[in-house]
Amino acid sequence: MPTLYVVATPIGNLEDISQRALRTLREAKLIAAEDTRKTKRLLNAYNITTHITSYYEHNKKSKLGYILKQLEEGDVALVSEAGTPGISDPGYELVVAAREKDIPIVAIPGPSAIVTALAVSGLPTDRFTYIGFLPRKSGERRRSLQSIADGVGTIVAFEAPHRLQEALADLLLVLGDRRVAICRQLTKLHEEVFRGTVSQAQQYFKEPRGEFTLVIEGKRDKEKPKVTGDILKQLKTLKASGATAREAVAKVVLETGLSRKELYRA
């Protein structure tokens, strides 16, 4: 049965593509590409002559029916401008339409700027939130950041070079001076990964160029208070002044946030 293949392609270096992906592109009846120029560059590099059609944000409605019709006759390979289709691009809508028609959907995994940036960021990767491209307008951007400000997981976002400084200013305002890894031109000749704080990044990227993936530290858990020598001394002083053990513990709990159990054990 004809199948829709969701094919990951390189995010920069053309060598970052699997043999399975190349075979799928070669054998498909049609390739639906978000950016035909970039995809043709990849196909030419590997001598692939499969017919290609454009499928991007501004023609997705008019092209959807055509691509579904082609799927009645043979396999279609969906590719994005770079990386894995369906992430911040119209590929998602084609997948939904294929699913509604019970067309088999198979992923051909591979490059992803999100995972690549996380892997080299030096920030926690056990839990993360991807928020796509940051909104263009400052007000919307701040509201978007505020909605995830309390999340403890790492945050990943895309940003254009001409808006990077504005985005960093809003990051600092809404999230504070958190640790960040700002990845530029990943896998390309001039790849660069900046690791530091938001304020340091503001100073570093005076004239930003290229494509940026931002990896932002999640909200840090407040450090739990500990039973220190001073606290033990405070307990003894309270008891010496006539307070019962229960009263002394209650007062210290109120002042320090320590648990009663910890204080009774001390």
Locations of regions flagged by a protein language model:
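Glycine-rich, flexible N-terminal cofactor/catalytic loop recognition
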Residues: 1-58
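Loop/turn-to-beta-strand initiation segments
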Residues: 3-4, 73-77, 153-154
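Short active-site oxyanion
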Residues: 25-31, 102-106, 154-155
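General beta-strand structural signal in soluble alpha/beta enzymes
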Residues: 33, 80, 107-110, 157, ...
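Conserved helicase motor
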Residues: 53-61, 134-138
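Short glycine-cluster motifs
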Residues: 72-135
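A short, charged helix-loop
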Residues: 129-150, 216
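A contiguous loop/helix-start segment that scaffolds small-molecule binding in enzyme catalytic cores
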Residues: 154, 158-266
